Amino acid sequence: MLAYRSPSRRLQRPGGALLAGALVSAVALLLTGTGAAAAAPPSPDEPVRSGHAWMGAGTRIEQGPASSAAAGITPMDTSGVQGIDVSHWQGAINWGSVKAAGIDFAYMKATEGTSYKDSRFNANYTGSYNAGLIRGAYHFARPNVSNGATQAGYFASNGGGWSKDGKTLPGVLDIEHNPYGAMCYGLSTTQMRTWINDFYNTYKARTARDVVIYTTAGWWNTCTGGWTGMSAKSPLWVAHWGTASPAVPAGFPTWTIWQYTATGRVAGVSGDVDRNKFNGSFARLQALANNTP
C-alpha cells in the first residue's frame, strides 16, 4: 500500500513529475485495456449480493469452487475451439491479449433478473468484438423474481439481441443452482418447465434465435425433473468441472459448449476465469453465430 501523503503536497507543482507520471499511467491504461486487478467473487461461505451472480455462482455449490484443480485438470489439457465467459468480476480485460492467447469465443454477462445490468458488459461486448472474437451475451435467471417472458424481454432489450454479422452468438439463459437460496428457486418441476419455455418463446420471438441453455446435469435433472422439452430446440452449454467428459442432463443428446473449469487462466484477464470448449470446429462455431446449417 502506498504511504499516505497529504492532499496539499500531492497537489503542489501541477506541471511537475508527479502529474506527468499520472498522465503516462492513465494513457498506458487506455492503450492496453487493462486496469486494476479484479475483485475476487465471494468465497463459498459468503452470500452473493443480489445482482452480482455470475455464470457458475450456483454450480460451485454443487461441484465445489476448486474441483478442477483438485482433479489435476488444467485449462491447456483441453484442446479444440476455446472460449471464456466473464462478468464484472473479471474487471478490465485486455481482449487483444485474450485473442492472442488462442481464445476464439467469449460470452459476457449482460443482465440478471429484471433490473440488473452488468457494469462491464458494454466494455466487454465491444472490446471482444474489436479484438476479433466471436462473442455473445448471457442472462442470469431469477425464476423467483418474475416470469420467464419478462426476463427474456429484459435480456433482449439490454444486450441479448442478435445480428447476423458473423461475430454474434445467440444469447444464453444461465439457469443453475440458486446462489441466493433454495436450489430450484421455490418452483415445482412443472412451474420451472413453464418458466423456461416462456423465456425461450419470448427470446425466439424477439431475436429469431434459439436461446442457448447453460446448466448442470444435477440442477436440470432435479429442478425440471429431467425434462426433455428443450433438447430439440436449445443448444446445451453444460457445466461440469474437474472431469475428462461432462455429464449431460437428461433429454439432451449432447453438449454444444462445455464449461470445464472455473479456475482457468488466460493472458489479458486478471485472476481466475471460466474456460470453455466448443463441441466442433471453428467453422461450426461460425455457423452457430450465423444461424446457418
Annotate each predicted stretch with a short phrase.
Residues M1-A40:
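Secretory targeting and sorting signals
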Residues S6-R9, H88, W95-A100, E176, ...:
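Short alpha-helical interface patches
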Residues P41-G91, G229-P293:
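Functionally critical loop-and-helix segments that line ligand-binding/catalytic clefts
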Residues I73, D77-Y200, K204-R206:
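Substrate-binding cleft of extracellular glycoside hydrolase catalytic domains
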Residues N94, N147, C223, V248, ...:
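Short acidic, gly/pro-rich beta-turn/loop elements at beta-sheet edges
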Residues S115, N144, W220, S245, ...:
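Flexible, glycine-rich phosphate/dinucleotide-binding loops
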Residues K167-G251:
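Catalytic domains of cell-wall/extracellular-matrix polysaccharide-remodeling enzymes
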